């Protein structure tokens, strides 16, 4: 099994896109990259912990590759915005790919280069690729939010602008690029 740790705005919206893929074993919402141990949601929202809202995905590399995980990831948010996502602004909502080994780092950098070269987006992809430091699972009420609160989840996606972008911002599958 392998692990991918990815941030792209509100973690509620990063879970569901991965659930329908074979080889994805678990998806946990949490906080990653900061200096405060075991932060709470309230602490992370102050933008003083260094953490971002992220998901940690456990996957079977024999079934789905890290590159495939990145293909799904880049269809879920705006990678040209480094200051948050949609109406969620600030440090805790910035996108980040946290790599767990050099192969993940290389794959992420190649994927970003390919997206930029293909000019998939109107602006350059600015999603940073950073070494993995830590991950703290979020409070239980944040886990599988789309299942626990489907009406609110849907309203949040539509109201934030994320739903429209997740369907339209890629004009061809990123898997064709790398």
What is the predicted role of each segment?
Residues 169-178:
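Single conserved hydrophobic/aromatic residue that forms the stacking wall/gate
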Residues 1-170:
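Flexible coil/turn and secondary-structure edge motifs
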């Amino acid at each position: 099994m392998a692990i991918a740790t990815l941030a792209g705005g509100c973690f509620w919206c990063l879970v569901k896109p991965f659930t329908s893929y074979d080889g994805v074993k678990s998806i946990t919402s949490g906080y990653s990259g900061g200096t405060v141990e075991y932060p709470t949601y309230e602490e992370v929202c102050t933008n003083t912990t260094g953490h971002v809202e992220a998901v940690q995905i456990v996957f079977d590399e024999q079934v789905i590759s890290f590159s495939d995980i990145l293909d799904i990831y880049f269809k879920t948010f705006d990678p040209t915005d480094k200051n948050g996502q949609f109406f969620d602004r600030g440090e805790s909502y910035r996108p980040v790919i946290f790599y767990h080994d050099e192969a993940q780092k290389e794959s992420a950098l190649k994927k970003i280069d390919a997206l930029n070269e293909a000019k998939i987006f109107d602006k350059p992809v600015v999603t940073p690729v950073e070494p993995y430091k830590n991950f703290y699972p979020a409070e239980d009420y944040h886990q599988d939010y789309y299942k626990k609160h489907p009406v609110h989840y849907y309203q949040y996606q539509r109201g934030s602008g994320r739903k429209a972008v997740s369907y339209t911002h890629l004009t061809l599958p990123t898997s064709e690029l790398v």
